[in-house]
């Protein structure tokens, strides 16, 4: 079943700080996109008002069900705006994450990145995600009491690789997200 997730919390270090309106889409067959636009961009952020945007196919993520509502996902993003824009001190390569379902219906993601290089100290992060109903136009919370959710929403994926761009478009129910990166 496809999924649409709204990020509620982002935390690096001891203090949470959510400055974006982040939505992530996952297709039925495991392709994914995460768009993270700033709510109030300022300064240099105005030229590219996204904290980050990335996408990948089901070939760029390894998923393992650990049982009891815990899943590990190891991502190696196919498209990554931090790489494309050559943003300093950002992670390159596989990101190992653990996802845990909460009784509230939210999903906690934890992991670590290596923004200063794989041989340097890691930086731990935590994100809290709220599933939303992709068949609705509004952001409608899914499964607040952790009951089984079913939807008639379908997913469509378009992957673009041509001489000018690499890109991925995912349609989840009534929602669409896309990332396109020009080739150099």
Swiss-Prot record:
Entries under InterPro entries matching the protein: Hri1, Hri1_N, Hri1_N_sf
Top-rank taxon of the source lineage equals Eukaryota
Spell out the Gene3D superfamilies in the cross-references: Protein HRI1, C-terminal domain (2.40.128.310), Protein HRI1, N-terminal domain (2.40.128.320)
Question: Does the record carry Nucleus as a key word?
Answer: yes
Where is the protein situated, by its record's location annotation? Cytoplasm; Nucleus
Keywords for this protein: Cytoplasm, Nucleus, Phosphoprotein
Q: Which residues are annotated as modified residue Phosphoserine in the UniProt record?
A: 143
Subunit relationships: Interacts with HRR25. May interact with SEC72.
- Write down what this protein is called: Protein HRI1
Q: Which organism is it from?
A: Saccharomyces cerevisiae (strain AWRI796) (Baker's yeast)
